[in-house]
A protein has these predicted regions:
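Mature-chain termini and adjacent capping regions
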Residues: 1-181
Length: 181
């Protein structure tokens, strides 16, 4: 018994308990943070997307509340058969849970199952409309052609794209050419 008491007394000495001089602000307590996150997004029990990132930072007290996705983002979008129909990657994003919209930024790349590729520095996903939007320079690579523009509207699998202020080579099928006679 005396040995146990001495052991307990030694464990509670100067080396046993440490004091923290850190003061955590009230604002810091209102922010949730998670590392190495994978999120499955579903609707009516059907998986629609899988999102992976190194860091989530949630701020429910902001107006409007948001979730920052830092240090690289990768999303796979699925069709009803659970096949990947497109992927999205970027360095950062901000998710607004009130309307399920995303603001994706910095080195944004969207690739569909056909290999068509969209590159830009900023892209907005409007969940209600189920479309991507951008107002900054964009690059679209389809087959052997590259188109540039400032701004776009597109569906999530890039099967339909409207490029604003378009420039570059636009492929046209021979039967779509006007008669020159």
């Amino acid at each position: 018994m005396a040995f146990s008491f001495l052991f307990l007394l030694a464990a509670c000495g100067q080396g046993g308990v440490s004091k923290s001089n850190k003061v955590v602000s009230e604002e810091a307590l209102k922010i949730d943070r998670a590392d190495s996150v994978t999120v499955i997004i579903s609707k009516d029990g059907q998986t629609k997307a899988r999102l992976k990132t190194k860091e989530f930072v949630q701020n429910d007290n902001a107006k409007p509340p948001y979730l920052d996705i830092n240090h690289n983002l990768f999303v796979e979008f699925y069709n009803d058969s659970m096949a990947v129909e497109s992927t999205l990657s970027a360095k950062t994003a901000r998710f607004y849970p009130a309307n399920n919209n995303f603001l994706v930024q910095d080195s944004v790349v969207v690739i569909n199952k056909s290999g068509d590729t969209l590159k830009t520095q900023q892209l907005v996903w409007n969940n209600k409309l189920q479309k991507f939007f951008s107002e900054v320079p964009v690059q679209i690579i389809r087959g052997g052609s590259v188109s540039y523009g400032t701004g776009l509207e597109a569906n999530k699998d890039l099967s339909w794209i409207r490029i604003f202020q378009q420039r570059g080579t636009v492929p046209v099928e021979k039967d779509q050419m006007p008669d020159t006679e």
